[in-house]
């Protein structure tokens, strides 16, 4: 048996050149121009068909969707609650009354958040009568004014620091928006402290009331200029309190369909936060 002779570099190079282009058969990379044309045509038609099929299925799906109202809304039967400003760590508002730098961010966030609620920003909105639902047929939807004065001591009008410098900090509570939600009753926000005799809790508007005139909400695109109703929670620590640390829990009350208890979601319709005010 003879050993296979090893090809020289020049032989290998010649074979590669012949593979790349064979002048005798006119093949390029082992295929004739006709063969290359057919295979390119096949893949062009194949991937073109896939792209067309994908585009068609997406178009069909988009025809079933409404650009203004979500198609499926049954998974969100009742709204949750959110607080503002958002603290940097969890839901703990920790600051020092004697150091403005520690609560500067809270104050700035509140001012920026409440700018759309100013009289100037709402001059083109509707002054709706209170106490009743504001049903609208469209296609044009009016947005009701929410006067920032309803927040009273937490409006930033009389106290530009929103009570933080006096040990009476304000936190805004808002209910998540759900399109075409209609409360069955008169909703309001109640807040309690888990610790006794440390701080008093005051809500604005009075009794934490959320007026029915802000319902129903018709969606961001249809209900242009909508102002979400707010409830301000002011934590008033006693002047002689040695410990200025309290946990507040707020929840939705006053209606039969806005829930604040759920075995699967313990935060449905409620929110809990802590306020720690150092001297």
Swiss-Prot record:
The lineage of its organism: Eukaryota, Metazoa, Chordata, Craniata, Vertebrata. PANTHER family: SODIUM/POTASSIUM-DEPENDENT ATPASE BETA SUBUNIT, SODIUM_POTASSIUM-TRANSPORTING ATPASE SUBUNIT BETA-3. Residues 1-35 are cytoplasmic. The C-terminal lobe folds into an immunoglobulin-like domain and may mediate cell adhesion properties. Belongs to the X(+)/potassium ATPases subunit beta family. This is Sodium/potassium-transporting ATPase subunit beta-3. One of its GO terms (biological process) is sodium ion transport. Disulfide bonds join 128-144, 154-170, 191-250. InterPro entries: Na/K_ATPase_sub_beta, Na/K_ATPase_sub_beta_sf. Gene3D superfamilies: Na, k-atpase alpha subunit. It is found in: Apical cell membrane; Basolateral cell membrane; Melanosome. The keyword Protease does not apply. NCBIfam families: Na_K_ATPase_bet. The chain crosses the membrane at residues 36-56. Induction: Up-regulated in distal colon in response to K(+) free diet. Residues 186-279 are annotated as: immunoglobulin-like. This is the non-catalytic component of the active enzyme, which catalyzes the hydrolysis of ATP coupled with the exchange of Na(+) and K(+) ions across the plasma membrane. The exact function of the beta-3 subunit is not known. One of its GO terms (molecular function) is ATPase binding. Pfam families: Na_K-ATPase (PF00287). Glycans are attached at residues 124, 158. GO terms for cellular component: apical plasma membrane; basolateral plasma membrane; caveola; cytoplasm; melanosome; plasma membrane; sodium:potassium-exchanging ATPase complex; sperm flagellum.
